[in-house]
Design a protein with these regions (language model features):
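PLD/PLD-like phosphodiesterase catalytic module centered on the HKD motif
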Residues: 1-185
C-alpha cells in the first residue's frame, strides 16, 4: 500500500471516529439536516454495542425498516436479542415493512403486534441493554426514513444510571405491553 493510501485511510478513520463521537455526544435529537441531530445515527451506534434491544413504535414503514435492517441483522449475528412491538394505530404500519423484517430476520427477532382494539397505541421508544447499564430513547420517531433522519422529530435519550426510577417505569411498561397485550407476528 502506498504512503498516500495509508494517509488517506488514517484520515478517513479519524474522520469516522470524530463523526461517531459527535453523534454519540448528544442526548437530544431534533431531526433536520445535521446528522448529529438525527435519531438514525444514534440508533446505529447503540445497535452496534447492545446485548439486547427492545423497540416499541406505533408504526413501521418500509423506508425506515430498510435503513435499520442491516444493523439489526448484525446485532442478531453478534448474539443480541431483539424484540419489536408495533401496532396498526391509524392503519399506518405497512405490511411490506413487516414482511421485510420477517423475511430478513425470521424467527431471530421476537416481533409482536399490539392487540387491544379499544385503546390507542402511540408509543415511540428504543431501549438498549448493555453490560452494566441501559439507554432508552423516547420521543416522536416511529420507524420511517423521515422520522429517523430529516423530519422534525424530538427524541431524548437517558440511561438507567442517570435516571433509574424513570427508566424502570418505562421498561416495566414495555414488558407489560409486550407480554400481556400483544400477539406474535
Amino acid at each position: 500500500m502506498a504512503q498516500s493510501d495509508i494517509t488517506e485511510n488514517l484520515r478517513n478513520t479519524s474522520e469516522t471516529e470524530r463523526i461517531t463521537q459527535e453523534i454519540w455526544s448528544t442526548d437530544v435529537m431534533t431531526g433536520g439536516s445535521d446528522r448529529r441531530m438525527q435519531l438514525y445515527y444514534q440508533l446505529i451506534q447503540s445497535l452496534k454495542k447492545a446485548d439486547s434491544v427492545d423497540i416499541i413504535v406505533s408504526f413501521l414503514m418500509e423506508s425506515g425498516v430498510k435503513m435499520l435492517l442491516e444493523e439489526l441483522d448484525n446485532a442478531l449475528k453478534r448474539g443480541a436479542k431483539i424484540r419489536i412491538l408495533t401496532g396498526n394505530y391509524l392503519g399506518i404500519t405497512q405490511p411490506s415493512a413487516l414482511y421485510l423484517l420477517k423475511k430478513k430476520l425470521g424467527s431471530r427477532v421476537d416481533m409482536r403486534f399490539y392487540n387491544e382494539k379499544d385503546r390507542s397505541f402511540h408509543p415511540k421508544s428504543y431501549i438498549f441493554h448493555y453490560r452494566g447499564y441501559n439507554d432508552i430513547y423516547i420521543g416522536s420517531s416511529n420507524i420511517s426514513r423521515s422520522a429517523l433522519t430529516s423530519g422534525i422529530e424530538w427524541n431524548y435519550r437517558f440511561s438507567s444510571v442517570s435516571d433509574p426510577k424513570n427508566y424502570e417505569k418505562f421498561y416495566q411498561a414495555f414488558e407489560e405491553l409486550f407480554k400481556h397485550h400483544s400477539i406474535i407476528i
